[in-house]
Amino acid sequence: MPGGRRAPDDEIIIRARDVSVQFGSNKVLDGLSLDVKRGEILGFVGASGTGKSVLLRTILGLNPKQGGSIEIFGIDYESAGDDARLAVERRWGVLFQHGALFSSLTVLENIQVPMREYLDLSPGLMHELAMLKIDLVGLQPDAAEKFPSELSGGMIKRAALARALALDPDIVFLDEPTSGLDPVGAADFDELIMTLRDTLGLTVYMVTHDLDSLFQACDRIAVLGQKRVLV
């Protein structure tokens, strides 16, 4: 294990088998298979165009696949009914590469978006829970009322992570979480991810080009190439 932090459990959270994804005549993934184990930080690395983000979006149901199967928590998300899909979605959180915060909403309101979509909570309880997430990711309380345009790159990443944690997920998907951060900020973010994994019992699926992140934070590394997982 590169990070040497913790041995993952044997339970498989994500099981992908013989997955193929094609856009027009361009086949991006071909016969890809993968297991993600509970409790691990799994890092994905590969040259540009090898399909790291495509695989992530396919797992999340944002890209259609042309072959194979993907089970999340034992459920085939693509073919599941609405209730089963909703149950799966409530158990994951996603941090997209550039944060993807809503520019017209404050940090607090951004964190509350998943709560409004999936839960039936009072405004007071949503405020309290959102403030807890802000503290959890190391932001100061006054960040709650700031808009994304008022945040530094590191603060945007942390605010987006707080939103990803809004529903107390079992797994978080991180797409290039340290891109745009200086080495100190990236190292701090890696430390935060490891701490959250240990304290919250998270499973972490991380796409990254950051070699320091791979060796500092990840328990296991998957190398994508030739349209599948090589290692």
Task: Identify the function of each model-found stretch.
Residues 168:
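Conserved catalytic motifs of ABC-family nucleotide-binding domains
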Residues 172-175:
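Catalytic Walker B motif of ABC-type/P-loop ATPase nucleotide-binding domains
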Residues 60:
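Helix-to-loop junction immediately C-terminal to a conserved catalytic motif
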Residues 45-47:
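The feature captures the beta-strand-to-loop junction immediately N-terminal to the Walker
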Residues 147-151, 155:
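Conserved ABC ATPase signature
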Residues 76, 123-142:
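Conserved ABC ATPase "signature" region
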Residues 214-216:
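A short, surface-exposed alpha-helical micro-motif characterized by mixed small hydrophobic
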